Design a protein with these regions (language model features):
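N-terminal strand-loop element at the rim of the active site
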Residues: 6-77, 160-168, 174
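A conserved mid-protein helix/loop that constitutes part of the nucleotide-sugar donor-binding site
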Residues: 15-23, 208-231, 246-252, 294
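A short helix/loop element that forms part of the nucleotide-sugar donor recognition site in Leloir-type
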Residues: 49-54, 187-203
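Nucleotide-sugar donor phosphate/pyrophosphate-binding loop at the beta->alpha transition
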Residues: 76-83, 118-120, 128-146, 150
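Short His-centered aromatic/hydrophobic patch
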Residues: 99-104, 123
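Donor nucleotide-sugar binding/catalytic pocket of nucleotide-sugar-dependent glycosyltransferases
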Residues: 145-194
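Aromatic "clamp/platform" in nucleotide-sugar-dependent glycosyltransferases that forms part
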Residues: 269, 288
Length: 294
């Protein structure tokens, strides 16, 4: 039986983007292990993470808590996490490591090289791209180029990343997979009416309702929508944000400073996104960078 380690910085990435791979590997009778931080840094709720762990257990997947920090600048914490990762690799003989996220990719490929384990790295959108800040190029490009040499298969999800990886990086193999797929039918029908959803959220039935779904961080750039709303006081605009993250408090304070606190609602992690989309009028997608914008 082949033993595969799925590695990422945080558990929410595995939950949101990697479950199809995990199920496929289990269907192929592989012994699957998931190593990541189940405790900190996740962009979903602790309750969702607990459910996710139960789902993994039901599939027969082994979980390992690795205390990664999401930021590459938390060197001490990530060094400790790297020691934890090496302990996992010493305990079991793995046939392959599949790593995700920049931090997971760095330490995963470093460990794979040390233990001579074949490694796959999925780049969910490089931080360097045409039009990216110079700082991104100075920091991330040399690191990704260096670790590409330690990569057996480098998976990209957009054409710009693929073309650059083929031309400039030296992974043994570079492939492009156009994302994780989309199920339009999943969002075709709501379980509640538009009116019911708005009443539950205490929103006017005649409001122009904006919605964004995703982690609340600077890259997602939700602040620009709130600032735009302040410039259109004549319109009955309301904005709901589904997600959690470090920007939540800032966004609440920004809305208050612009006298929009009653029109901007941060709902946190939601499992009724389909209903919320049907109750909304405009989907807002103001990200500065997306590996695969849909």
């Amino acid at each position: 039986m082949k033993r595969v380690l799925m590695l990422s910085t945080v558990a929410s990435l595995q939950d949101q983007f990697n479950m199809a791979n995990i199920r496929m590997l289990r269907n192929l009778h592989c012994d699957v292990h998931v190593a990541c931080n189940f405790v900190q840094g996740n962009n979903t709720s602790p309750q969702r993470i607990a459910v996710f762990q139960n789902e993994l257990a039901a599939l027969g997947v082994t979980c390992h808590q690795i205390d990664f920090a999401r930021s590459p600048f938390h060197l001490l914490q990530n060094h400790r996490a790297y020691q934890q990762l090496k302990a996992v690799l010493r305990a079991d003989a793995f046939d392959c490591i599949h790593c995700h996220t920049p931090v997971g990719g760095i330490y995963g490929r470093q460990a794979a090289a040390a233990f001579q384990i074949p490694v796959i790295y999925t780049a969910h959108g490089f931080h360097f791209f045409q039009g990216a800040p110079l700082w991104n190029w100075l920091l991330f490009y040399p690191v990704e180029k260096y670790y590409a040499r330690k990569t057996d298969v480098l998976i990209t999800i957009n054409s710009e990343d693929y073309d650059r990886a083929v031309r400039k990086m030296h992974a043994k193999q570079v492939v492009r997979i156009p994302g994780v797929g989309l199920k339009p039918g999943k969002y075709r029908f709501a379980s509640r009416s538009r009116e019911e959803v708005r009443e539950a959220l205490d929103l006017p039935l005649d409001a122009i309702l904006l919605i964004s779904v995703g982690e609340l961080n600077r890259n997602k750039n939700h602040r620009v929508i709130i600032q735009a709303m302040a410039r259109l006081p004549q319109l009955p605009l309301y904005y709901i944000l589904c997600g959690k993250g470090k920007e939540a408090e800032f966004l609440q304070e920004l809305a208050q400073s612009l006298h929009l606190s009653n029109r901007v609602r941060i709902l946190g992690y939601r499992q009724d996104v389909c209903d919320l989309l049907h109750a909304s009028d405009i989907f807002c997608f103001p990200s500065k960078r997306e590996g695969l914008g849909m």
